[in-house]
Structure formats: C-alpha cells, structure tokens
Design a protein with these regions (language model features):
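Short beta-strand elements in bilobed, periplasmic/extracellular small-molecule ligand-binding domains
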Residues: 34-38, 150-159
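N-terminal beta1-alpha1-beta2 submodule of the flavodoxin-like/Rossmannoid cofactor-binding fold
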Residues: 1-106, 178-231
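Short, glycine-/small-residue-rich phosphate/pyrophosphate-handling segment
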Residues: 95, 109-156
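A conserved mid-domain beta-alpha-beta active-site/ligand-binding segment of alpha/beta enzyme cores
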Residues: 154-167, 174-188, 193
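Short aromatic-enriched loop/helix-cap "lid" or pocket-rim segments at secondary-structure transitions
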Residues: 48-50, 133-134, 167-170
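Glycine-rich beta-alpha junction loops
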Residues: 44, 126, 159-163
C-alpha cells in the first residue's frame, strides 16, 4: 500500500496538526505500508487558472509548470491520500486548497479507468468544540460522495484543543495526551489492515481533555501572558 500525505500547515512539523498526523503515519508504516509526506510550505503550487486546458486542449496535463507536475503522478498512483490541515477561517489552509483544486487533470469526465483511492482527513484546531470541523467534513463528504468519484472517504482524525495539548505536555500532564497520540497511531495501523478507520478510534482521537469552561479560562490566561510579553 502506498500512502501519500500532504500537510498543509505553514508550521509543518512544529504545527498542531503534526501532533496527530505524525503518529498516524507512524502507525501506517508499522503496519507495512509505504508513506510519502509533503508539506505545502515547501512546494511551489499556484492556484488553478480555470482555463480547462487539462480537459480539452491537453487532456490529463496541467499547463502550469510548477511543483504540481511532480505531485500529480503521486496522487494518481497513491492507494491512500491523507489531507492534513489546521482549521483556518472554517476551512483548510489556502495552499492546500490550491493543491486540491489542481487535481482537475486527474478527474477527466468519463474516465472510468482511474485508480481508486481511499481518503483520510487529519485536522486540528485550537477551539474546544468539535463542531469547528463541520465545514471541513462537509467538503470531504461532498467531494467523495459524488457518483462518478474514484475515491472513498474512510475516516477523519479531528483534534480540537491542540494548544491545550501542548501546554499539558509542557506541564508534564501527559496521560490523556498519550492516549490521544496512541489512538492516532492505532488509526494508522487499522487503516492499513482494514481499509478504514473505525468510529471508536476517531472518537478517541477527538475526546475532550478538560471541561469547556476550564479550557477557555486557561486559554485566556495564556493569551494575556502572551500580550504582556510583547509589551
């Protein structure tokens, strides 16, 4: 199994999304699959120009000469595609959206011979509420539920409160955090073995680490301290 992961976080491995993405990919490797990871921060990929030349002028070929020329064949051959992104303004990051838009050459109308893929979403946000991910889930479900799609959406690892997770790690309160990280690793193994991620494991990755009011109180105190340090 070949897995292609695209991390859309501008902070790459220092970002909150990597807290879940990296152990998830470790689990995939441990189960025997091959993983290739790219960061949009390191790629030069412009937005789709919408001229449809990849359909009608040069079918299957994008006319823009940038890093998408290297990514497109990898997307085409992957057994599993992992989209990873923090929540930015109720959506994925702009660079990742550009990359996703640029897949147009791979979805030629009437092309029934395309390889079928499984798709996973990994996302993080600083808020407590799991509902913050609803717009991203709506996009994934819309993309991969179309009757002519060659892809299947097989699970989402959604992690709210990621800033809180980092603070808990700094304070040495790693028990609950370790459980979340282990669940992400288990999700990787399960994906390879069973072809999808169970609802049970998805819930373990997303579970609350503290009550809502306590979380936002701690978050406000952290923001106040950050402001004072800048004065």
């Amino acid at each position: 199994m070949n897995v292609l992961a695209i991390n859309g976080s501008p902070r790459m491995d220092e970002g909150n999304t990597a807290i879940i993405l990296n152990p998830f990919l470790d689990g995939i490797r441990e189960a025997g699959a091959n993983v290739e990871l790219f960061y949009t921060r390191k790629l030069k990929i412009g937005p789709c120009n919408g001229d449809m030349s990849c359909w009608f002028k040069n079918p299957g070929k994008c006319g823009q000469n940038d890093d998408m020329q290297m990514i497109l064949p990898k997307l085409k051959e992957a057994d599993v595609i992992v989209w990873a992104s923090p929540v930015y303004y109720a959506g994925i990051t702009g660079p990742l959206k550009n990359l996703m838009d640029r897949q147009l050459p791979l979805i030629m109308l009437g092309d029934a011979k395309s390889k079928k893929h499984k798709v996973v979403l990994v996302s993080s946000c600083g808020a407590w509420e799991l509902s913050m991910f609803d717009p991203l889930l709506a996009q994934m479900n819309a993309l991969y539920s179309m009757p002519d799609t060659n892809s299947e959406f097989v699970g989402a690892l959604l992690r709210p409160m990621t800033e809180g997770m980092k603070e808990m790690i700094k304070a040495g309160e790693t028990g609950l955090v370790d459980e979340v990280v282990q669940a992400a690793r288990d999700a990787g193994r399960q994906l390879v073995k069973e072809g999808r991620i169970s609802e049970d494991i998805q819930k373990k990755v997303s579970k609350p680490l503290m009550p809502r009011d306590a979380y936002y109180k701690a978050a406000q105190e952290m923001m106040d301290q950050a402001k004072k340090s800048m004065e």
